[in-house]
Curated annotation (Swiss-Prot):
Name this polypeptide is given: 7-cyano-7-deazaguanine synthase
Family: Belongs to the QueC family.
Binding site for ATP: A10, S11, G12, G13, M14, D15, S16, A17, T18, A19, A20
Binding-site positions, Zn(2+): C190, C198, C201, C204
Species of provenance: Halobacterium salinarum (strain ATCC 700922 / JCM 11081 / NRC-1)
Encoding gene (name): queC
EC number: 6.3.4.20
Amino acid sequence: MSAKRAVVLASGGMDSATAAAVAHNAGYEVYMLHTSYGQQTEHKEHECATAQAAALGAADFLHLTTDHLSKIGASSLTDDEMAVADADMESDEIPTSYVPFRNANLLAMATSYAEANDCEAVFIGAHSEDFSGYPDCQPAFFEAFQQTVAAGTKPDTEISINAPFVDWSKTDIAERGLELGVPYEHTWSCYRAEAPACGTCDACAFRLQAFQNLGERDPIEYAERPSYT
């Protein structure tokens, strides 16, 4: 009997690296998909995603490059004219780092990749602290996209959209990843810089807070390492 297969959207960050480990631990052959879409730290993210795939022994690693999201703009991740804001961990506003409808674009590519390779699942590392600010990280979005996949693929295709951390905090993810031996030294979260991480953008803040909550030291280098606990 052939092993079950899953595509993992591999951003290079700690959430997707942990999602890949969870999929692998559940018995899936992992097909990792990394996309460069014009984000400011795309080279570092690609480097990290490649290292993660090697460490996990991924069955395949696909790197896609697309520029339409950066041409559309309206996000500080892709638009040089928009500054990446300092961390505001209490805000309920949609942050400037939101890339309009990005996850639908990425999941569409992942579904194509999955169907072409007879994969039965797609994993994405979105979590509860994401959907407080990003509308395309909400459980309702993934439920709706699941219906789109069912309607838009071949009749005999069955692909489940899995967001295993959708009810988890960043701390929960870090704790599980440490249990699974995720190489967090080969992950990147910073929105601003490729080395060292800034330590003060939203992504750095939530990441540092997760490790601090667990009493662990984040293994990557930071320009600043504030306390977020």
